[in-house]
Amino acid sequence: MELYLDTADLEEIREIAAWGVLSGVTTNPTLVAKAFAGERLTWERLSQHLKAVCELAGGPVSAEVTALEAEAMVEEGRRLAALHPNIVVKLPTTEEGLKACRALSAEGIRVNMTLIFSANQALLAARAGASYVSPFLGRVDDISWDGGELLREIVEMREVQDLPVRVIAASIRHPRHVTEAALLGADIATMPHAVFKALLRHPLTDLGLRRFMEDWEKVRP
């Protein structure tokens, strides 16, 4: 399973990319707004930022449209895709989003359909030509449903139906979600910087390393 960072923060991407385990990045309008801390964006400023994200990520970067109607989504998606070969256009899973997905995918532009909360939505997205579908585990858990079960259904359906789509486990809240996604067969898990860091931490690792160093200090030359 590939590991993506869910952020638009260049420093966060730079830090995790240095580990040698990062395969891509996902962004959304909220994350972009957070990265610019209330700055009023121009297209030139946004495009420069997304290009920088692509260079740091070294793999697919999902950039989401802000338009709500299909025709405008397609136009915005084309502009985003033209910025860098790594750009994947992110669309909401709505009627207009499906129309835009079909049009963009027909032009050879990769699409990530987001805000997926049911297996049927994932099926529709795949049939519309999406390259990726992004079920939201954490938000499903928040309403007392089972995000893991949703992911299991989508992965199983993809296999049974032989759908040419990759499944991104999204809305990941904690390391257990990552383990669950890997065990359930997700192709990709995308997570915030804090969760990525938490994957590595374990108190017994710290304790063991400290003990090794203490013992070494007793005998080193």
Each model region followed by its residue ranges:
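Active-site beta->alpha loop and helix N-cap motifs at the rims of alpha/beta catalytic domains
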Residues: 3-5, 9-13, 19-21, 27-103, ...
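Catalytic beta/alpha-barrel core
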Residues: 4-6, 62-69, 86-95, 109-124, ...
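Catalytic cores of alpha/beta
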Residues: 11-19, 72-76, 100, 118-128, ...
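Glycine-enriched alpha-helix->loop->beta-strand junction motifs that scaffold or abut catalytic
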Residues: 20-24, 83-87, 103-112, 127-134, ...
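Glycine-rich phosphate-binding active-site loops on the catalytic face of alpha/beta enzymes
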Residues: 24, 29-34, 115, 132-143, ...
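Conserved, mostly hydrophobic/aromatic
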Residues: 28, 89, 125, 181, ...
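Alpha-helix-loop-beta-strand connector modules within alpha/beta enzyme cores
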Residues: 44-61, 81-82, 98-111, 146-167, ...
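C-terminal alpha-helical cap/extension of soluble enzyme domains
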Residues: 158-221
